[in-house]
Amino acid sequence: MKALLDLFKQVQQEEVFDAIKIGLASPDKIRSWSFGEVKKPETINYRTFKPERDGLFCAKIFGPIKDYECLCGKYKRLKHRGVICEKCGVEVTLAKVRRERMGHIELASPVAHIWFLKSLPSRLGMVLDMTLRDIERVLYFEAYVVIEPGMTPLKARQIMTEEDYYNKVEEYGDEFRAEMGAEGVRELLRAINIDEQVETLRTELKNTGSEAKIKKYAKRLKVLEAFQRSGIKPEWMILEVLPVLPPELRPLVPLDGGRFATSDLNDLYRRVINRNNRLKRLLELKAPEIIVRNEKRMLQEAVDSLLDNGRRGKAMTGANKRPLKSLADMIKGKGGRFRQNLLGKRVDYSGRSVIVVGPTLKLHQCGLPKLMALELFKPFIFNKLEVMGVATTIKAAKKEVENQTPVVWDILEEVIREHPVMLNRAPTLHRLGIQAFEPVLIEGKAIQLHPLVCAAFNADFDGDQMAVHVPLSLEAQMEARTLMLASNNVLFPANGDPSIVPSQDIVLGLYYATREAVNAKGEGLSFTGVSEVIRAYENKEVELASRVNVRITEMVRNEDTSEGAPQFVPKISLYATTVGRAILSEILPHGLPFSVLNKPLKKKEISRLINTAFRKCGLRATVVFADQLMQSGFRLATRAGISICVDDMLVPPQKETIVGDAAKKVKEYDRQYMSGLVTAQERYNNVVDIWSATSEAVGKAMMEQLSTEPVIDRDGNETRQESFNSIYMMADSGARGSAVQIRQLAGMRGLMAKPDGSIIETPITANFREGLNVLQYFISTHGARKGLADTALKTANSGYLTRRLVDVTQDLVVVEDDCGTSNGVAMKALVEGGEVVEALRDRILGRVAVADVVNPETQETLYESGTLLDETAVEEIERLGIDEVRVRTPLTCETRYGLCAACYGRDLGRGSLVNVGEAVGVIAAQSIGEPGTQLTMRTFHIGGAASRAAVASSVEAKSNGIVRFTATMRYVTNAKGEQIVISRSGEALITDDIGRERERHKIPYGATLLQLDGATIKAGTQLATWDPMTRPIITEYGGTVKFENVEEGVTVAKQIDDVTGLSTLVVIDVKRRGSQASKSVRPQVKLLDANGEEVKIPGTEHAVQIGFQVGALITVKDGQQVQVGEVLARIPTEAQKTRDITGGLPRVAELFEARSPKDAGILAEVTGTTSFGKDTKGKQRLVITDLEGNQHEFLIAKEKQVLVHDAQVVNKGEMIVDGPADPHDILRLQGIEALSRYIVDEVQDVYRLQGVKINDKHIEVIVRQMLRRVQITDNGDTRFIPGEQVERSDMLDENDRMIAEGKRPASYDNVLLGITKASLSTDSFISAASFQETTRVLTEAAIMGKRDDLRGLKENVIVGRLIPAGTGLAFHKARKAKEMSDRERFDQIAAEEAFDFGTPSAPAEEPQHPAAE
């Protein structure tokens, strides 16, 4: 019977578990894991290569070296399984038990675990309430700690030096006990009564008032409560027994030449054992205390090094002077266990090769080299050979395959038919980086790739390599075919645009074929059908671009949808079109009108065309259509014979005069500068602006010349038509190149940037066609090198950003259909500077409406709440001019531990409502991270040519309507009768006749208004103008200027321009002022009226004070008369640097990391009225009196710019001091919706600048994850501590429980965490540990006895389960459901039998699967 049971033992059932718990192991636990004590430091006998007994590789402890064979060879073979050899003591079993059997070392003296000592904050320190330094002194035998003070005046845990100790012993004798080393600390830990301490701390927390104490107590309470809850004893932080890793995990490999390669751990263990044995011997010999003490200290250090080398003091080094790799180093970092072996594994059945273009493939195919396929599909071929009886054994089959007999090739064809393979191109930045294809066998050694999937893989054929992977199981093949097949992934998940858009030569071919020419051969002919056109074209009667009339048959959707009616019906109509378009109409899918093709097909048009096809005709038709477009494009491009030659680059004749005029203007500015009318900075700004404009002008002239050409029409008159110049066609079609690049070829290269981003003011007036001279070439190398340097740096940064994003969102999965919330956000079109940057339709497409969408004119409901707004809906909404729609958003979704489909809306990569199980978090992270890398790789394409927009200096209306000013707009009328704006946040709206807002423009401070409130204007009317180069300081009151604190050499400096010799007063930076006194004063102006009295602000007793900021150039003199609206000083704006995602990527990172900006603007904490209090040294005091009359004070540094004036009403959350916004303030004062709007808009700004489209919802998903913690403000009756940060879902669960039990729930504030912080503070310790700061995370988790419920994707990958997303979510759900039903059945049976046992069965509280230790 026992043998039978043993047989069962062999097959290890894989454990099913739902959670993993981590904790501290007690000494007994460690002994129970162990299979024996390691007593000797020996490893293996280097003559016999057999492990030494009781050593680190002992076979008696860890198991046999060979399968089923004991060490001495007495028992061999399977029949002795389980026997323990009496001679060598080795159990006869599998050798692989040496990978799992642990040993232990009994330490002669206890040793502190370094992680709990040194990993900050020190847990030992917290529990004992001692400082880390003191504990260290005790542990390393430098001081005594009092354990029992007895009747003496000493205190427990008091530290004393050796000298003190001996004095006290003389004084008190053995009244008290003090110890040294880990024994002492262990005694102290044992003495702690946790329950009592927790009670005391809770009462202290309630009674204490000091912030510092509250913080300290809360921290300590948290740790102690964790001990209390988890049942872990604090003294287990001190080791008495040290576990020994199984030997196969720290191997010792003999090299040839009698040397050994060994894991560093063996060295570290040897040291521990040696010191431990020496200590044992010293203790037996009753050696002097000082020697024993030294040995104990050395043992402590040896164990420290084994656990975490280098954490304390110098790292232990091996023979070759490099630090040894300890246990902690094994798991942390990129090369550690988590990231190297658990999250990224190497897989078999894979190969890689160079890719070449496969233009004859269908979209779902790839060409696989025969030899590769033969190797990859070997097992399948062996199987087939055996089944067919060609080979009798695997060995024979192997031989067949090696000889590559004809039958093998036939079988290979059969095996790979309909067996998809996966292709992957590194770096895999988004999910389209891995797609499945059906292999087609080809000769040669390169993989053939379909040209249309290149965009998704970001692949090109200049030597890129791709990897092939074979899905083996049937399920894997099915998933690859349904989810990953290239023809099922035709949209980008980032923005829902088609990813299979033709590019380069395909675009050129299609464009060339759909252009029209004036007076081409056969113009004006009429044809009865497309076939006739083709015949005429083949017989050279017409050209591709000839204008002709053709009768074209379109297949339109049948209105009659009854049974048996055809889906499409033909519709014939006569079109005026061109030959090329008529020929292309053959491939149009059913359901698309000919009008979509009846225009020149540029890249954008083709993208739109494919998009329309996808929405109207479905996936299959679109894929076929795209394939046919590609074939036609290649064919037509070949036939077109377009080429580039130097003569295509036409330099405009007016170039010289344009450049000459600019040079004259620059001279004029130089002259003005010399005579002191402008500052150096202003001169530089203006010069750069002139050259930008010149560059534009030359470019424009060049494009005008390139883009049209003169022709004679049919009537013999000369007219102009769009040019057939090759270079122009390439750029215009979007095939390659851009207007900027053509301008460098044939216009002028323009301004160049230095590596720091500032612009060199002498432009390169030559172009590449004329050639650059040496100086010009030298200037341009600057930018080119910067581009290359940037690329290298930014790729790494972008990859790290993606990694952080993935980590923070990896556990966000769609888990239910609808959470039923009624919250959402109001979406409006995004308008900047009067331009609609993003239309409303784009922002609400694919979202679910949360309130009914109502027709503004008839007030009838168009779409009920809960409708998914698709293309037709958003077009209708746009047509009716609805300007705001409330939609669901991931931010307000009420699903716990996930998202619901309705709040997320459309899955952009599939074009329909998102499926339950979709890992939307990872998709969001990829969508934001992928372009980051793309962009950073693209900085250098403009060759550093400074692409800087000329600065806006006016604003004009885009539409007809009525001007309205917002409530914040304030202006004064100056002596000339001009209206000067003195508000900083004023906006001008333009409304149509029924009062709907059409556009809105910010009007800056100091602008001159040209239109007033209520004026009716036409489109194109200027509303306001201003000087973009300087910021003025304007007075709102008239009077005589009286300077205060304007002392030369103290607060202001006389700047004498070295060129002009004229002087101006400039306010000096506070840091550069000499004396302490001058740092606190602020140069300012008061105004005196005719009687010499100070002018007061109307309605108050405060005198008008106008302060000058640092850097201001004061333009008035002391005692000068000024009028209302006059400029007192100017602040020159910084010279602008070129914008480029180089600045952009760090910006995105700092937004997602929620960093508070330096010198952040200050927001009003309450709604109320402002007034200025008494200024303190260096600060001015702003007071806001709220509606109840309470005063809130803000102290503001004097050099800051205050945006409010006296007695102004401000709203809570309004900016009162200028500066960049702090996201934490926005969340606190304006709420989640405002915060999300801020982050989304800011992130989108960066990407939009690069022309990258990302859907808002991806950014919202990330923001949701940044908001997943809350801070408890009042704990009610819950288990939380005030001030503690907890997971939102946890807190809501706990509150639900409290409400159900009729107790008081906790109240909380939202907290915004940066993505790194949010990843580390996740509930899953496995996920956090594999991200960053592994040691700290694991230490904390172990003390808390944390339990990881394996909710996210990462944790599950690490423990090797199916991830709870996609098909895995369904699997886990089914498993849980089955368990529940099994348990219910079990309970039922138990209940029926309960009366037999006479005991009612306890309900199964715990899940059946205990947490795996």
From Swiss-Prot:
The gene is rpoC. It comes from Burkholderia vietnamiensis (strain G4 / LMG 22486) (Burkholderia cepacia (strain R1808)). One of its GO terms (molecular function) is DNA-directed RNA polymerase activity. Binds 1 Mg(2+) ion per subunit. Zn(2+) 2 binds at residues 819, 893, 900, 903. Gene3D superfamilies: 1.10.132.30, 1.10.150.390, 1.10.1790.20, 1.10.40.90, 2.40.40.20, 2.40.50.100, RNA polymerase II, clamp domain, RNA polymerase Rpb1, domain 3. SUPFAM superfamilies: beta and beta-prime subunits of DNA dependent RNA-polymerase. It comes from the Bacteria. InterPro entries: DNA-dir_RpoC_beta_prime, DNA-dir_RpoC_beta_prime_bact, RNA_pol_asu, RNA_pol_N, RNA_pol_Rpb1_1, RNA_pol_Rpb1_3, RNA_pol_Rpb1_3_sf, RNA_pol_Rpb1_4. Keywords: DNA-directed RNA polymerase, Magnesium, Metal-binding, Nucleotidyltransferase, Transcription, Transferase, Zinc. Pfam families: RNA_pol_Rpb1_1, RNA_pol_Rpb1_2, RNA_pol_Rpb1_3, RNA_pol_Rpb1_4, RNA_pol_Rpb1_5. This is DNA-directed RNA polymerase subunit beta'. Its EC number is 2.7.7.6. It catalyses: RNA(n) + a ribonucleoside 5'-triphosphate = RNA(n+1) + diphosphate. Its cofactor is Mg(2+); Zn(2+). Zn(2+) 1 binds at residues 70, 72, 85, 88. The RNAP catalytic core consists of 2 alpha, 1 beta, 1 beta' and 1 omega subunit. When a sigma factor is associated with the core the holoenzyme is formed, which can initiate transcription. DNA-dependent RNA polymerase catalyzes the transcription of DNA into RNA using the four ribonucleoside triphosphates as substrates. Mg(2+) binds at residues 460, 462, 464. Belongs to the RNA polymerase beta' chain family. One of its GO terms (cellular component) is DNA-directed RNA polymerase complex.
